A protein has these predicted regions:
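Well-ordered, non-membrane alpha-helical segments in soluble/globular domains
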Residues: 60-63, 126-130, 160-169
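Terminal substrate-recognition subdomain of acyl/acetyltransferases
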Residues: 1-46, 140-223
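A conserved beta-strand-loop-helix scaffold within acyl/acetyltransferase catalytic domains
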Residues: 57-108, 112
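Conserved acetyl-CoA-binding loop-helix of GNAT-fold acetyltransferases
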Residues: 114, 120-136
């Protein structure tokens, strides 16, 4: 069950500017959670990472510092799920695409993480849905890059390919499709995956650039 309230929050990190945050309460069998979009660095700093949140940095404390560094960049968007004690149990981050994709306009990389202690409660779906409710989403290209070395599939008792299927289903439910690509990091493991959501009003130049980058190498895996 979700209940929503919307408010404006003053963000001291942005020299007097106002950052808009939305908050929803989410009731689970493990207890109530809060979903908050537009999280400021000061808000992130006031929380702590749940013990099961260790996907990218392997330790909750480092995961929290990584999340804080993402929130400190004004062009990034951070959406959190946290409990009444201030423990972060899930997060979605949106950051401008770089490196291989850096010349594509209005393009973001999305990352989704849920604590291993809070799985199978629908949190990832609710976080994704909430994070994608921003004004320019239909003018945006959003790409998810899934790398098997970040996944905790062994702890879940599954193969990395089954974990890959789980990721594909999660994103497909929110308008993403899987694309073959020659991007070097994706090609390092056949279990790796690239998904993308092309907004309904994305400009033609950005779309053409995206497909050109997918095919940038002469060798495209799977063909």
């Amino acid at each position: 069950m979700l209940k929503e309230r919307t408010h404006h929050a003053n963000d001291p990190e942005e020299s007097g500017s106002i950052r808009i945050s939305r908050v929803k309460t989410y009731k689970t069998v493990a207890g109530p959670l809060f979903l908050r979009s537009g999280c400021s660095p000061s808000f992130v700093e006031g929380l702590k990472a749940d013990e099961g949140l260790r996907t990218f940095a392997r330790l909750p404390e480092r995961e929290h510092q990584l999340l804080l560094s993402i929130a400190q960049q004004p062009e990034n968007k951070v959406t959190l799920a946290y409990d009444a004690s201030g423990n972060i149990v899930g997060q979605v981050s949106l950051a401008p695409l770089d490196h291989w994709w850096q010349d594509i306009g209005n393009a973001y990389e999305i990352a989704v993480v849920v604590s291993s202690s809070w799985r199978k409660l629908g949190i990832a779906h609710h976080l994704l849905s909430f994070a994608l409710e921003f004004e320019s989403v239909e003018e945006s290209l959003i790409v998810g890059l899934g790398f098997s070395w970040h996944w905790d599939y062994e702890e879940l008792g599954m193969s990395r390919f089954r974990y890959r299927e789980m990721i594909a289903r999660l994103f497909a439910a929110h308008g993403f499709a899987e694309y073959l690509t020659s991007e070097p990091n994706i090609r390092m493991d056949p279990a790796n995956i690239l998904v993308a959501r092309l907004g309904s009003h994305i400009d033609g130049e950005s779309m053409n650039c995206f497909f050109q980058r997918l095919l940038q190498s002469e060798t495209l895996p799977g063909l």
